[in-house]
Amino acid sequence: MPNIRILTETDLRKVIDLDQDAIDCVQNAFVALATKDVRMPPILRLDIDDYNGEVDVKTAYVPGLDGFAIKISPGFFDNPKLGLPSVNGLMNLFSSKTGMLEAVLLDNGYLTDIRTAAAGGVAANHLARKDAKHATIYGAGVQARLQLKALTLVRNITSATIWARDLAKAEACAKKASLELGTPVSATTDGKDAAANADIIVTTTPAREPVLMADWVKP
């Protein structure tokens, strides 16, 4: 039997953070996807409509790498009402040479959170104005704070706004983000006003109806 390493979320948090290395790693993955014969099948998605949930299974193989991962990522969007996170999951790492399981990453969605935020940082680095100062985030969950942090890694963000339908949630997120980043962060439930002065806008909600209108965005 192979020696299978099991890493918990606590283990992973000790060695992986949302930093410039994470952004560079995700950018390198995008470059590989565009320039190499990457094998990436369509996402397998299972909808659990009864509980406002879905499960996504994702994988890819980059030629030349010794391993590949398969990610199982449930998203149950009523979970916050139960005091649970909306997203969790795990990843299994396999040998590219033998197909043998080498590691189980019990990250509870942490690696997905980091990867998603880092991708936002990559996008902002290539698309946002160099002099962008004010960021607006639509959403007030974990990803909202992480996206804002990612923006601060690629631009000199001096202020930010958190929008949410629930003002208390927006205020809680804004307070936590401000303490983490040392940047003034305000909260609002006015989506139009939130967009008015934004240099960068990021949406981080699972909303199925629009929360941002095109005519709100300044040129």
Feature annotation, model-predicted:
Residues 106, 140, 165:
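Cofactor-binding loop segments of dinucleotide-utilizing enzymes, especially the Rossmann-like FAD-
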Residues 115-136, 142-154:
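Short internal alpha-helix immediately C-terminal to a glycine-rich phosphate-binding loop
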Residues 153-181:
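NAD(P)-binding Rossmann-fold cofactor-contacting core
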Residues 182-219:
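Rossmann-like adenosine-cofactor binding region
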